[in-house]
Amino acid sequence: YCQEFLWTCDEERKCCGDMVCRLWCKKRL
């Protein structure tokens, strides 16, 4: 299961797709 856009994330909880984790999931520019 992955973290959606703007959900909090960490090493254990990865973001969905190719979003990057910066404390929360952000879309790649």
Swiss-Prot record:
GO terms for molecular function: potassium channel regulator activity; sodium channel regulator activity; toxin activity. It is found in: Secreted. It comes from the Eukaryota. Disulfide bonds join 2-16, 9-21, 15-25. SUPFAM superfamilies: omega toxin-like (SSF57059). The modification Leucine amide is found at residue 29. Coiled coil: none annotated. One of its GO terms (cellular component) is extracellular region. Keywords: Amidation, Disulfide bond, Ion channel impairing toxin, Knottin, Neurotoxin, Potassium channel impairing toxin, Secreted, Toxin, Voltage-gated potassium channel impairing toxin, Voltage-gated sodium channel impairing toxin. The keyword Disulfide bond applies. Expressed by the venom gland. Its main location: secreted. The keyword Secreted applies. The presence of a 'disulfide through disulfide knot' structurally defines this protein as a knottin. Belongs to the neurotoxin 30 (phrixotoxin) family. Spider venom neurotoxin that blocks voltage-gated sodium channel Nav1.3/SCN3A in human (IC(50)=1 uM) and rat (IC(50)=1 uM). Partially inhibits human Kv11.1/KCNH2/ERG (40% at 10 uM). Negative results: has no effect on human and rat Nav1.8/SCN10A. This is Beta/kappa-theraphotoxin-Pmu2a. It comes from Pterinochilus murinus (Mombasa golden starburst baboon spider).
